[in-house]
């Protein structure tokens, strides 16, 4: 098991309930694959440094989790097929 950190930005057109539902969805992906979510930090709505997909702000979330080496690939796939995700990044913590 390794420690990972992911930051993802969700579309700002979501309401607060939709934002939290998406965060729970991603937590569920991690937990269903046998991983554990260590920390979730909801940064809220912030302005982007530059426009992405014609959007200038988004909901930022930082999530730390522990999982096997295959889970980041699955989480990346889920991020890519979720329309509300503007950007995401998954890194290994040392």
From Swiss-Prot:
CDD domains noted in UniProt: bS6
One GO CC term, this protein: ribonucleoprotein complex
MF term (GO), any: structural constituent of ribosome
Lineage top rank: taxon: Bacteria
Keywords carried by this UniProt record: Ribonucleoprotein, Ribosomal protein, RNA-binding, rRNA-binding
SUPFAM superfamilies assigned to the protein according to its UniProt record, in alphabetical order: Ribosomal protein S6
GO biological process: translation
InterPro entries: Ribosomal_bS6, Ribosomal_bS6_sf, Ribosomal_S6_plastid/chlpt, Transl_elong_EF1B/ribsomal_bS6
Pfam families: Ribosomal_S6
Biological role stated in the UniProt entry: Binds together with bS18 to 16S ribosomal RNA.
Family under the similarity heading: Belongs to the bacterial ribosomal protein bS6 family.
The name this protein goes by in its record: Small ribosomal subunit protein bS6
Gene symbol of the encoding locus: rpsF
